[in-house]
């Protein structure tokens, strides 16, 4: 009942999409989103070692372009952890693939544990080519995926229209 109330209340307030930020809900929640007509923006869970404030908060807001194959910079130096990430990403996609309301996959948000985001987008696309992918939501865009989302908190933002992706 609480799940239904929360989703219905968001619809009443005018929302048509909910973001599942770094977590996966029980399947019943997705069922109610399907039934009530609420779209879902699905993030993958964060991972990696302790994050550096410089890489997560400072450099990203300076607009610096950083390649995400610098694993130590993104707190992803552990190769076994990177392998495990793909195992869990595959499990999440397989679990939620038939969710009608699922509208967008997001493997990485704001650089938290980000690595090889272009490869992550390819991995997702091979498992599910029916939904758009925001490969690096917010910061450290690597030029891939279907969407370029910018999380801009501290300075005025000036929009530039992209030709190859939605922005």
Regions inferred by a protein language model and the residue ranges of each:
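N-terminal active-site wall of soluble small-molecule enzyme domains
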Residues: 4
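Metal- or metallocofactor-binding catalytic centers and their adjacent structured scaffolds
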Residues: 13
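Substrate-binding/catalytic cleft of secreted carbohydrate-active enzymes
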Residues: 7-9, 17-167
């Amino acid at each position: 009942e609480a799940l239904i109330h929360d989703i219905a209340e968001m619809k009443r307030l005018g929302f048509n999409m909910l973001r599942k930020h770094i977590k996966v809900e029980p399947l019943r929640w997705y069922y109610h989103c399907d039934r009530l007509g609420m779209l879902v923006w699905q993030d993958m869970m964060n991972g990696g070692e302790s994050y550096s404030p410089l890489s997560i908060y400072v450099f990203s807001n300076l607009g610096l372009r950083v390649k995400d194959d610098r694993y130590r910079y993104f707190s992803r130096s552990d190769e076994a952890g990177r392998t495990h990430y793909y195992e869990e990403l595959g499990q999440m996609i397989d679990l939620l693939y038939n969710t009608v309301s699922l509208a967008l996959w997001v493997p990485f948000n704001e650089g938290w544990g980000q690595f090889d985001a272009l490869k992550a987008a390819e991995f997702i696309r091979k498992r599910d080519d029916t939904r758009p992918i925001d490969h690096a939501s917010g910061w450290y865009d690597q030029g891939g995926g279907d969407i370029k989302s910018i999380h801009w908190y501290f300075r005025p933002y000036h929009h530039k229209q992209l030709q190859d992706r939605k922005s």
